[in-house]
Amino acid sequence: MKENIIQQKSFLFAIRIINLYKHLTAKKKEFVLSKQILRCGTSIGANIEESIGGRSDKEFLFKLELSYKEARETIYWLKLLKETDYITITEFKSVFVEAEEICKILAKIIITLKGKI
């Protein structure tokens, strides 16, 4: 089965988050915020994958809404990392743009699905 765009983007985003986590723990010796962003940044795609295996439209919607919330939380931790100088503005913008794009795609899917349920 071919992956859809949100599956692809969330998977690639998770890889970026894992690499950011490695950078933060190895180079910056930051272990608290980095764990938070690792958890929520990788759970976006995990929840999307779970939604695909959902038993009903409501379960599908619920998992997508969880993904959206995790994406918003990821943005929060990114902002904190930037404002506390753990990541540069350039590093922030690069990941932030992807997180925002994932949020927009998920929001559109959720709105469309709510209209059908």
Where are these regions (language model features)?
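Short, C-terminally biased terminal segments at protein or domain edges
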Residues: M1-E50, G54-I117
